[in-house]
């Protein structure tokens, strides 16, 4: 019998991002209790040698989101791709599919966190009381309408310390982004001074 390959998307991330993600998940599971029902599986509980951790996040209707972090993978093209990665799966019974970080954040947002959403505009106009803030800003991936922006400017969201774990933040590529210069003078080395 020949080998059967299964291809899956694994986002390359650095080791420190995975450590930060795991500590945020554990904090909100055990200390702040904002992540009720989440399940954390350690590397020694997994049968796969490359799995470093798993986070199971239950959603609606028997479905769940599973974020698996890996170690010991082949290194990437860049020096900082040291063989660490993340896969994001949506599971319902025996069906599994992979999702991107934005969709994962939206699914978490819809299920777990209070939101000052688009429906708040209509309720505020009608004079109903609305939830004044969104506790999970990572779940919003688009710019809202002008009314929504006006309401959010009027009522500023409260910052939660430590922040809630965001899948998009976990897999973002901060290495390939150009570095921002500070101040109005710009970078001295680039200006030739």
Swiss-Prot record:
One of its GO terms (cellular component) is host cell cytoplasm. Coiled coil: none annotated. Counteracts the innate antiviral activity of host APOBEC3F and APOBEC3G by promoting their ubiquitination and degradation. Acts as a substrate recognition component of an E3 ubiquitin-protein ligase complex: mechanistically, Vif hijacks a host cullin-5-RING E3 ubiquitin-protein ligase complex (ECS complex) and the transcription coactivator CBFB/CBF-beta to form an active E3 ubiquitin-protein ligase complex that targets APOBEC3G and APOBEC3F for polyubiquitination, leading to their degradation by the proteasome. The BC-like-box motif mediates the interaction with elongin BC complex. Residues 40-44 are annotated as: Interaction with host APOBEC3G. The modification Phosphoserine is found at residues 145, 166. InterPro entries: Vif. This is Virion infectivity factor.
């Amino acid at each position: 019998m020949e080998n059967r390959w299964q291809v899956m998307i694994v986002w390359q991330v650095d080791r420190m991002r995975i450590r930060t993600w795991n500590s945020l998940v554990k904090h909100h599971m055990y200390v702040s209790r904002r992540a009720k029902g989440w399940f954390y599986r350690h590397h020694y509980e997994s049968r796969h040698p490359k799995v470093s951790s798993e986070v199971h996040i239950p959603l609606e209707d028997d479905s769940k989101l599973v974020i698996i972090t890996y170690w010991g993978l082949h290194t990437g093209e860049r020096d900082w791709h040291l063989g660490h990665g993340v896969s994001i799966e949506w599971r319902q019974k025996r069906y599994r599919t992979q999702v991107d970080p934005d969709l994962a954040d939206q699914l978490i947002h819809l299920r777990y966190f209070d939101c000052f959403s688009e429906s708040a505009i209509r309720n505020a106009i009608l004079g109903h009381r609305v939830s004044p803030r969104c506790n999970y800003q990572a779940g919003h991936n688009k710019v809202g309408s002008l009314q929504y922006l006006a309401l959010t400017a009027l009522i500023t969201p409260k910052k939660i310390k430590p922040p809630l774990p965001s899948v998009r933040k976990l897999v973002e590529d901060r290495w390939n982004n150009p570095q921002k210069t500070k101040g109005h003078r710009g970078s001295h080395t680039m200006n030739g001074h």
